[in-house]
From Swiss-Prot:
Name of the gene: SUVH10
InterPro entries cross-referenced by the UniProt entry: H3K9_HMTase_SUVAR3-9, PUA-like_sf, SET_dom, SET_dom_sf, SRA-YDG_sf, SRA_YDG
Family the UniProt entry places it in: Belongs to the class V-like SAM-binding methyltransferase superfamily. Histone-lysine methyltransferase family. Suvar3-9 subfamily.
Task performed by this protein: Histone methyltransferase family member that may lack methyltransferase activity. May methylate 'Lys-9' of histone H3. H3 'Lys-9' methylation represents a specific tag for epigenetic transcriptional repression (Potential).
SET domain sequence ranges: 126-290
Protein name per its UniProtKB record: Putative inactive histone-lysine N-methyltransferase family member SUVH10
Organism name: Arabidopsis thaliana (Mouse-ear cress)
Annotated positions binding Zn(2+): 250, 300, 302, 307
Amino acid sequence: MGLVGLHSGTIDMEFIGVEDHGDEEGKQIAVSVISSGKNADKTEDPDSLIFTGFGGTDMYHGQPCNQKLERLNIPLEAAFRKKSIVRVVRCMKDEKRTNGNIYIYDGTYMITNRWEEEGQNGFIVFKFKLVREPDQKPAFGIWKSIQNWRNGLSIRPGLILEDLSNGAENLKVCLVNEVDKENGPALFRYVTSLIHEVINNIPSMVDRCACGRRSCGSKHVFREKLSVSSSLVISAKKSGNVARFMNHSCSPNVFWQSIAREQNGLWCLYIGFFAMKHIPPLTELRYDYGKSRGGGKKMCLCRTKKCCGSFG
């Protein structure tokens, strides 16, 4: 976080100095906090959080006491009084690692309230309520939604099938429709790999020898133009996988690439999809269908700013 300038402090709060000649206690103001869920922080709400002040604990085997408006609590108090924007990073435990954490940047917040209350140890602690600024893309909210779906605490909106692959994939492929009332696709066979006819003729650049059949004659991994005499058509009408449901877009976020791969001494054709840019969680994957040799134009429904109105 320090490398990207998000949070450079070694503690759960970062502050900067400000010029305020009329307020001696306002020379430092909080600009970033990390809510780790410790110190009685309340972090379950995706649009707000309760941040506990600093001090008054026996973290270093000292005597517990009431928290005071001093040291690290002063920058938080200054941000509250001046209604200054504060960056918030949510810290969550990584379930895949014993001592690992996951940090989620959740945008900018504003401290809207500050009060004192009795803590779990019987001493007074400071509480700061931070509310997320409007018109920001969800971050921690998406994380919490996914957790609730996995744990069965809530149902994903528009969910039709929990696993379209019926266990064929390592990860479940959820079928979701948030656009219309269509209940699901027509009957088809879910496959995890492309069912194709083997390309019997090895490309001319590969020597026709045992060495060539082991792929050491050519070092090309991706091959856009294949030396194939007949046209190739990939149809997902009767069988396919998750790529079967990827829609067209005039502003795609993935692109397709043909791949020629040696398998058991023979060349086979595959299609791979690659990200064109950063894709946030729960974002629909779309690619440009391109131009077809026949069939005419079809109406485009991508509704992006660069929509051409038709494709094909």
